[in-house]
């Protein structure tokens, strides 16, 4: 018998206005990616999606650029949108939007080409996500996002960004599972434009442990005590996230951690279509999250960013071309999130 598929969201004008506002907000799109989203996508739970909207702004202190005697000021923006479109206990459709941006004020130039440094770098993506539970207990699905990552997004097809993943979750006992997947991206740090297979094992012996380890990623969540959580994730080749958090009071969470991350953008009017402008940085940070409503939170944090640099090339081997080194320095960050 064909199952009826129930809609879980009404696309009301207010929510769509918020969504479009993030895209049009001073050309400042961003992108929030959380470790919890990895766990959700590969988890055995289906049909529990909620509408989600997060936005984060991170201004950095003005710093010097090595060898150019120029100042560099940057504010980083992130946002994440998820709209469940239809779901039941065995099937779910959702729409995912990710937005990332750097608002930049500087007179720095790219040293090899002598071009002025972009005053903004934006990454805007949107696409569907699908998951289904089959009669044998397997879960299969995937997602596809299409967008543009550039100083001038959507200026031409040369700035188009495409990411796609297909996966299967194969149960191994009551709580554990194998995960096999195939991913493609034209804006990946390594093996760019290459369909990349992967395999991992989901190990969850209790509610205190969740380990997803394999190729090409690893994710670990551990709760040694009721109010203490530890998280770690790794993505090849230079993306690391580690965090420890403590539930101080019921609505208050304090945390600290380390991030090593990177971003890539297709500059408009670049000479080589395979080149991207890369940004790398490491962060140490601490913060507090206040769940002021059951479905809303406010997050304030501060930290120190170091090993910050940009370069232009096809991959990390080109890291000395058009390289711009930004001095280490502090930053602050504010994030708000809503669940409906």
Where is each model-derived feature located?
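Cleavable N-terminal export/targeting peptides
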Residues: 1-50, 311, 316, 340
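Transmembrane beta-barrel domains of bacterial outer-membrane proteins
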Residues: 35-173, 265, 273-285, 316
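Transmembrane beta-strand segments that form the barrel wall of outer-membrane beta-barrel proteins
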Residues: 55-59, 140-150, 176-187, 197-237, ...
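Structural signature of outer-membrane beta-barrel domains
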Residues: 58-62, 98-104, 147-151, 185-189, ...
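Residue-level signature of outer-membrane beta-barrel architecture
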Residues: 83-85, 130-132, 168-170, 184, ...
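Repeated loop/turn-to-beta-strand initiation elements of outer-membrane beta-barrel proteins
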Residues: 87-94, 135-141, 174-180, 208-211, ...
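Outer-membrane beta-barrel "beta-signal"
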Residues: 198-202, 286-296, 302, 323-340
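Outer membrane beta-barrel transmembrane domains
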Residues: 219-221, 227-235, 241-313, 318-320
């Amino acid at each position: 018998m064909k199952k009826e598929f129930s809609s879980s969201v009404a696309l009301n004008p207010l929510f769509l206005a918020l969504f479009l506002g993030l895209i049009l907000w001073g050309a400042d799109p961003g992108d929030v990616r959380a470790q919890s989203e990895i766990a959700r996508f590969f988890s055995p739970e289906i049909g529990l999606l909620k509408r989600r909207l997060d936005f984060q702004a991170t201004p950095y202190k003005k710093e010097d650029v090595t060898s150019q005697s120029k100042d560099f000021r940057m504010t980083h923006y992130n946002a994440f949108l998820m709209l469940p479109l239809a779901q039941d206990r065995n099937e779910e459709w959702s729409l995912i939007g990710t937005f990332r941006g750097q608002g930049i004020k500087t007179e720095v130039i790219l040293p090899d080409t002598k071009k002025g440094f972009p005053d903004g770098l934006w990454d805007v993506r949107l696409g569907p996500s699908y998951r289904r539970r089959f009669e044998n207990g397997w879960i299969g699905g995937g997602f596809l996002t299409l967008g543009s990552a550039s100083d001038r997004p959507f200026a031409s097809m040369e700035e188009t960004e495409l990411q796609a993943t297909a996966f299967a979750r194969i149960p191994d006992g009551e709580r554990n599972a194998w995960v096999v997947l195939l991913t493609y991206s034209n804006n990946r740090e390594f093996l760019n434009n290459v369909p990349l297979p992967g395999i991992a094992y989901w190990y969850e012996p209790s509610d205190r442990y969740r380990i997803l380890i394999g190729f090409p990623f690893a994710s670990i969540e551990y709760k040694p005590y009721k109010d203490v959580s530890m998280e770690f994730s790794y993505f090849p080749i230079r993306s690391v996230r580690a965090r420890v958090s403590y539930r101080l009071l019921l609505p208050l969470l304090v945390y600290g951690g380390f991030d090593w991350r990177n971003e890539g953008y297709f500059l408009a009017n670049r000479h080589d279509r395979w080149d991207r402008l890369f940004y790398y940085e490491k962060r140490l940070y601490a913060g507090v999250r206040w769940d002021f409503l059951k479905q809303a939170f406010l997050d304030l944090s501060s930290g120190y960013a170091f090993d910050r640099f940009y370069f232009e090339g096809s991959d990390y081997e080109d890291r000395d071309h058009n390289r711009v080194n930004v001095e280490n320095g502090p930053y602050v960050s504010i994030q708000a999130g809503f669940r409906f």
